[in-house]
Regions:
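Short charge-dense sequence patches
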Residues: 107-109, 191, 234
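Hydrophobic alpha-helical membrane-insertion segments
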Residues: 127-139, 175-194, 258-272
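N-terminal membrane-targeting/anchoring modules of bacterial envelope and secretion proteins
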Residues: 1-146, 150-158, 163-167, 319-326
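Glycine-centered structural positions embedded in regular secondary structure
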Residues: 40-47, 236-245
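Alpha-helical transmembrane segments of multi-pass integral membrane proteins
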Residues: 54-116, 145, 151, 238-333, ...
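Long, glycine/tryptophan/cysteine-rich extracytoplasmic
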Residues: 1-39, 156-232, 277-303, 310, ...
Length: 354
């Protein structure tokens, strides 16, 4: 009936903004992250109509989106708790409006000039985030190819009897593509992810418990290759550092340091939000938590990617190299002076003995 369809739409909307639904006393929280990314891009696109207004006016999208989200979920949702989606309903328009304001700032020739290290920090943080996302997409694709047989077997167990059933099942899983990429990033960072509260999967641990009947979970690694996997993000971090040293080089070492710190803050913020959106709750007891451990995964990726990317430009900075050269020269000079004093002392002792 139309009322049932409206109730389903309200529940789905709450899921998109990260809210919780309750059925038979059990809480569920599953975020179709690809749809959330689409909403951010849609907000960014719609804000183009405000080009003639001050850039700060784009922030009015936040209360407008939030109130609309509350109304849709509160008036139509049957199982959802409308207030639980508040955080997502704030973050989606906020990210879109900040994106629009930043891009319009760059295009505005009359805007006051931004400090180069500030703009470089945002660009460097975006570069590190983009590299992490692309590498995670490749890792997720490799896992999908390797586990295709298991995923197909789980799909057959779902009993799809028609083409529409198959399209619905596959399409629903496509909406979780960023989620699977986040799980892949958490895995090769060494932190791992949970397929249940008692089942951790990481390069050194393979969970042994049963998994929910979701075809994508058939791509979960069945072996533990070892900690050597973490060298992949470390290499990516060093590569980002080399690129940043070439593209975002600053003349002052202090500005270079501040740029690296700002880039790390941007990277950590994006990764933490990404990992949080990839967590889910699909039931009670074992399925009360699934996904990456947000704090641990964010910390590991910071150490493996952001930290090398920040240190490489500092180590290779001309000021650093000059300081190292001066220190090395001072050490050599002191060594030569010590050798001369030692030789003089030996000559005096020899003269005294004679």
């Amino acid at each position: 009936t139309p009322r049932d369809a409206l109730a389903l739409g309200g529940d789905l909307w709450v899921a998109v903004v990260g809210g919780t639904s309750v059925a038979d006393g059990v809480s569920y929280r599953v975020i179709p992250t690809l749809f959330g990314v689409f909403l951010v891009m849609l907000v960014r696109l719609l804000l183009r109509t405000t080009t003639g207004f001050p850039r700060s006016s784009a922030l009015f999208a936040v209360p407008g989106f939030l109130l609309t989200s509350w109304f849709l979920s509160g008036a139509s949702g049957s199982h959802s708790q409308w207030w639980t989606g508040t955080l997502g309903a704030i973050l989606i328009p906020l990210i879109g409006s900040i994106w629009f304001a930043a891009s319009s700032y760059v295009r505005d020739s009359e805007a006051p000039s931004m400090q180069h290290w500030i703009s470089g920090g945002f660009k460097m943080g975006g570069l590190m985030s983009l590299v992490t996302v692309v590498a995670s997409a490749v890792a997720a694709l490799v896992a999908l190819v390797a586990g295709w047989g298991r995923a197909s077997g789980i799909h057959e167990l779902l009993g799809a009897s028609s083409m529409m059933d198959t399209i619905f099942i596959v399409g629903g899983q496509v909406l979780f593509a960023p989620t699977m990429m986040a799980w892949a990033a958490a895995w090769w960072s060494g932190a791992g992810f949970m397929t249940a509260t008692d089942s951790l999967h990481s390069p050194t641990v393979v969970g042994t418990g049963p998994i929910p009947p979701i075809p994508l979970l058939g791509t979960v690694p069945e072996t533990a290759p070892g900690n050597w996997v973490v060298f992949v993000p470390v290499v990516l971090g060093i590569a980002c550092g080399v690129a940043s040293a070439r593209v975002y080089r600053r003349s002052h070492l202090l500005h270079q340091s501040a740029q690296g710190v700002l880039a790390s803050v941007v990277f950590v913020s994006i990764v933490a939000l990404w990992m949080w959106s990839a967590t889910m709750s699909m039931g009670s007891v074992r399925l009360a938590f699934m996904g990456p451990l947000v704090g641990r995964s964010t910390l590991y990726l910071f150490v493996e990617i952001a930290l090398p990317a920040m240190l490489v430009p500092l180590v290779t900075h001309p000021t650093t190299l000059a300081l190292v050269g001066q220190s090395a020269g001072r050490v050599r000079s002191e060594g030569e002076a010590m050798r001369r004093r030692h030789a003089e002392r030996l000559s005096r002792e020899a003269a005294t003995a004679s």
